[in-house]
């Protein structure tokens, strides 16, 4: 790896690690959770986190009808408050009606409010054009990714880039688009 490549990889990891630290700095993990054995962040990471301005996030007006379902899924699946809300905001192009209905699909063929690929929707047993069922399924899926990968940053990377890719290469090897996705979500709830 070239020195520039190593530097870019390090910056990419920081984009994931810093928001993850911010999301969990005030939480106390319970024994048996993936974070319970994690050592505290070092002083340099704490200083870096302190230097980043917290971005405020609130749901757009178009999301009002989904707010209770999102909050319920976040609570049910033990997600940090706002994580699923911000994730679905990005996935659905700010709760655009044509995305939620399935009328507009992603370039890759993802459908609905949670932008599930057809195979993922089938695996989860959900109709991706049913926004309320998809909200719950997205929360359930994110919890399973968190349980598998041990932190919300890696879970988000797996949701966006694919579980197999994160297993094979690690979240730090994710492409810039995925790293930006993770940073936008975790940075907004930090």
Task: Identify what each model region corresponds to.
Residues 1-29:
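Single-pass alpha-helical membrane anchors
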Residues 18, 42, 82-83:
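General helical secondary-structure elements
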């Amino acid at each position: 790896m070239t020195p520039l490549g190593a530097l870019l990889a390090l910056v990419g990891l920081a984009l994931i690690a810093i928001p993850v630290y911010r999301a969990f700095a005030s939480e106390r993990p319970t024994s048996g959770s993936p974070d319970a054995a994690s050592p505290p962040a070092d002083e340099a990471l704490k200083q870096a986190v302190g230097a980043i301005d917290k971005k405020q996030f609130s749901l757009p007006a178009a999301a009002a009808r989904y707010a209770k379902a999102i909050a319920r899924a976040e609570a049910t699946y033990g997600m940090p408050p706002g994580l699923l809300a911000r994730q679905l905001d990005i996935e659905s192009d700010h709760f655009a009606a044509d995305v939620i209905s399935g009328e507009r699909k992603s370039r890759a063929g993802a459908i609905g409010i949670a932008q599930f690929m057809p195979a993922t929707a089938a695996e989860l047993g959900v109709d991706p054009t049913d926004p309320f069922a998809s909200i719950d399924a997205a929360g359930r899926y994110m919890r399973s990714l968190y349980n598998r990968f041990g932190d919300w940053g890696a879970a988000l990377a797996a949701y966006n880039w694919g579980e197999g890719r994160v297993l094979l290469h690690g979240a730090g090897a994710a492409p810039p688009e995925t790293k930006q996705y993770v940073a936008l979500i975790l940075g907004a709830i930090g």
